[in-house]
């Protein structure tokens, strides 16, 4: 192992890798690729997560990237909706599919889904979507018309899309452009000519692990497991995938904790100086979703409930020095910052400058209002 590192170094390095310090100049797909996907069940938050990392951006640029096939939208990590790049997205989907969560007895008991039903559902969905863009109701109607699948109508109508997620992970469907307020589905090759397909898991693992550690390292296997699937993939399987990287991953000591990083990043991390940069990040931002809100170096344990709310809601956050020091909300023309009182005096000048940057991104006048929480 190399010399010990500090958590302020690690957090500053992550800020740099995640295009937050300094702000980057990459394309929209390159931001998504660097972050290993962007959580997207709240479309405005997803676009803002990308725009705050780009020195120059435009409203609607995510929608344009989707329309042009430079991004796809589908259920991915932790079963949640994400923006992915079509060239690489199939790699993470492959690992999720490898978990075979839908084959668990609990799925059969709850949904009445046997292996025979799954074997019939996949081709039914692919056939229904071949050359077509269908709303959920149109897709369900096509599926339940098939022999032996009529009982799935209610489950397929679930707002969470539980039965459709395994199909997304196997590359059978992804989201298409909305039709009014209704979602649509299509085949990934139709969504993007850049679609790279769902790789074999062993090949996919090397791609995804390298990408994850390039943005969220140093980290552990458990960090990766939680980010990918909330623990639904076995540690044994993950260890096999990790071992395939050989000496590409190396162990480092961060204030007494043993974690891993890509070998090519070790010297850069060791040379990184702590940062004092202040950033406002939107809800569900990858800065906290990547390591998880239970990473006490990013979100102090006593403040986890301020960030991670009921029903899976993740608050907009104020990051200073690489850790979460507050939350914020937009109230009319006011950006109301709730600065954690234990973090010391609020950096008012830095907060004002960051709100001015937000005002430029959103093309509106904003002012900062700082309070203690």
What do these predicted regions represent?
Residues 1-288, 293-373:
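Long, low-complexity intrinsically disordered regions
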């Amino acid at each position: 192992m190399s010399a010990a590192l500090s958590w302020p170094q690690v957090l500053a390095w992550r800020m740099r890798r995640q295009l937050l310090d300094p702000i980057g100049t990459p394309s929209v797909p390159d931001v998504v690729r660097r972050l290993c996907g962007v959580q997207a069940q709240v479309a405005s938050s997803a676009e803002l997560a990308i725009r705050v990392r780009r020195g120059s951006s435009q409203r609607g640029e995510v929608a344009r990237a989707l329309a042009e096939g430079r991004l796809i939208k589908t259920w991915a990590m932790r079963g949640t909706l994400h923006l992915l790049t079509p060239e690489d997205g199939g790699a993470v989907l492959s690992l999720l599919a490898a978990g075979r969560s839908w084959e668990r007895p609990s799925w059969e008991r709850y949904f009445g889904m046997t292996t025979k039903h799954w074997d019939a559902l996949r081709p039914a969905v692919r056939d229904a979507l071949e050359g077509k863009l269908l709303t959920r109701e149109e897709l369900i109607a096509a599926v339940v018309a098939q022999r032996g699948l009529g009982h799935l109508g209610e489950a397929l109508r679930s707002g969470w899309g539980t039965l459709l997620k395994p199909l997304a992970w196997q590359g059978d469907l992804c989201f298409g452009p909305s039709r009014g307020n209704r979602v649509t589905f299509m085949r990934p090759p139709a969504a993007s000519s850049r679609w790279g397909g769902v790789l074999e898991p062993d090949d996919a693992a090397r791609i995804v692990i390298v990408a994850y550690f390039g943005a969220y390292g140093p980290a552990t296997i458990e960090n990766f497991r939680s980010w990918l699937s909330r623990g639904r993939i076995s540690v044994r399987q993950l260890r096999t995938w990790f071992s395939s990287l050989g000496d590409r991953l190396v162990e480092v000591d961060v204030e007494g904790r043993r974690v891993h990083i890509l070998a090519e990043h070790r010297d850069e991390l060791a040379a990184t100086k702590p940062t004092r940069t202040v950033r406002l990040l939107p809800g569900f931002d990858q800065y906290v979703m990547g390591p998880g809100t239970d990473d006490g170096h990013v979100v102090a344990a006593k403040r986890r409930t301020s960030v991670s709310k009921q029903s899976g809601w993740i608050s907009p956050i104020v990051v200073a020095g690489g850790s979460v020091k507050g939350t914020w909300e937009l109230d009319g023309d006011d950006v109301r910052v709730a600065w954690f009182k234990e973090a010391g005096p609020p950096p008012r000048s830095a907060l004002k400058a960051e709100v001015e940057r937000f005002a430029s991104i959103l093309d509106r006048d904003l002012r900062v209002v700082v309070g203690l929480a």
